[in-house]
Amino acid sequence: MLMVISPAKTLDFETPPTTGRFTQPQYLDHSQELITQLRELTPAQISELMHLSDKLAGLNAARFGSWNPAFTLDNAKQALLAFKGDVYTGLQAETLSDAQLDYAQDHLRMLSGLYGLLRPLDLMQPYRLEMGTRLANARGKDLYAFWGTQISEWLNEALAAQGDDLLLNLASTEYFSAVKRSALKARIIDTEFKDFKNGQYKIISFYAKKARGMMSRFVIEERINSPEALQAFDVKGYRYNREQSTPDKLVFLRNVVED
């Protein structure tokens, strides 16, 4: 089973990594093409394109300017340890053992607007480029056009390498839209996490993101390799709901938020 998750806006390049092991991103030629274009933008243009404050626009203009594909532990960090959003709070990658990191390296991928697809130990330099950014480029009107079927083809390669055709989608709609389902040689398993609020079960973004990270951790710890085994996920009060689920969409409900 191969999992895909979204990246995060929040980054941590200050905390020392918990491992000295790393790999290099596989698709830096594509990243370099984007960086070359992004360097032509002024901070004001970046602010308008990405809907950022002047301060954040200036920060990311500087990041684009200093981006250098000669990645080392001195100027970059492993992707799974660098991202620090809600998904990664749920995943708690900093507490994974070496054996669990090895498993994650084979069975987990992070989608990225700049890097396309990252493995957990791939080094990355800090950036801000959400997949939904409408950056017109030589390949089309936005980043979805830029990546085209490429991400799907890379996922096919990863699926073939890890031994089955199961792709567990734990990414947001914005990011999984960069995966062309028609180009995938995979059975896609989608997920929904709902919390009880105001008399009904609903998807609450903050909790759903954390749950995606917790399920990623669950798969890594238990070495899950089937949709049926995923039904046992019961972290922090979530329970599989058979009535709302289908074979290719697993729904988990929670009545009370657990710390």
UniProtKB/Swiss-Prot annotation:
One of its GO terms (biological process) is response to hydroperoxide. InterPro entries: YaaA. It holds the Pfam family H2O2_YaaD. One of its GO terms (cellular component) is cytosol. Belongs to the UPF0246 family. This is UPF0246 protein PSPPH_1119. It comes from Pseudomonas savastanoi pv. phaseolicola (strain 1448A / Race 6) (Pseudomonas syringae pv. phaseolicola (strain 1448A / Race 6)).
